[in-house]
Amino acid sequence: MDTTFVQFLFYRLDPAWRRLPEEERACRSTEFAEAVEGATEITTHAYNMTGMKAGTDLLLWRHGTDLAELQASASRLQQTTLGRYLDIAYSYLGLIRVSTYVRRQTPQEQAVLETERGTYLIIYPFTKTIDWYLLGKATRQGMMNEHIKVGHEYEHIRQVLVHSFGLDDQEFVVAYEAEDLMEFQSLVMELRSTDGRKYTLSDTPIFTCVHRPLRDALELLV
């Protein structure tokens, strides 16, 4: 399997952008969209963040097999006119790896390569405690089996697990795709009572994102 790098770029929009003439904003948004679409070796999914998380206005969820190209294309976006009004507020990086705990993945797991995205994407950086890694493998597997069983009860919710060990501050980036946020919240509440929960060191900040076609997401910035 080719190495797949996954990057979540959260942008903060300079308020000065909204004071530009409407026609100029529309033109410059098109320039930015063309720069995204021109990076043909990278898959990009767009999410407008307006009103969803303070300090964030746009998420680009990107993945590709060449980290240098991910970096170069991000730089090209920053060089567009709109890009000069966008500061990176948060950035998370990792790899897709075969899970240690799941023998055979279902369509719920590792949905990163799907072309159709869910309406809602919920993302958070995640790190386990040191004590978790000092447990025996069988003990960890047992707790993960409980976690996985709960997840499979919510079959309409898809998960992407990105491994960040040694590449970023967190150990994982966890992303869920859902059509019903009430259902997703029920999943989270149920997972809170599993045994593995006590070995969570951190799982914030949490980002709730709304998927839109790229040009629609940019239009909401206008």
Regions inferred by a protein language model and the residue ranges of each:
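Glycine-rich beta-strand-turn "strand-cap" elements at beta-sheet edges
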Residues: 1-2, 42-56, 78-117, 157-168, ...
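A structural feature that tracks compact, well-ordered secondary-structure segments
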Residues: 11, 48-49, 59-65, 125, ...
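Short, surface-exposed beta-edge/turn micro-motifs
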Residues: 4-6, 56-58, 119-121, 170-173
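Short S/T/G/P-rich N-terminal loop/turn motif that feeds into the first structured element of a domain
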Residues: 1-37, 67-69, 89-153, 165, ...
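Short amphipathic alpha-helices in soluble, non-transmembrane regions
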Residues: 32, 72-80, 186-192
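Long, hydrophobic/aromatic-enriched structural stretches that serve as scaffold segments
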Residues: 32-65, 69-70
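A broad "ordered helical/assembly scaffold" signature
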Residues: 16, 60, 69, 81-82, ...
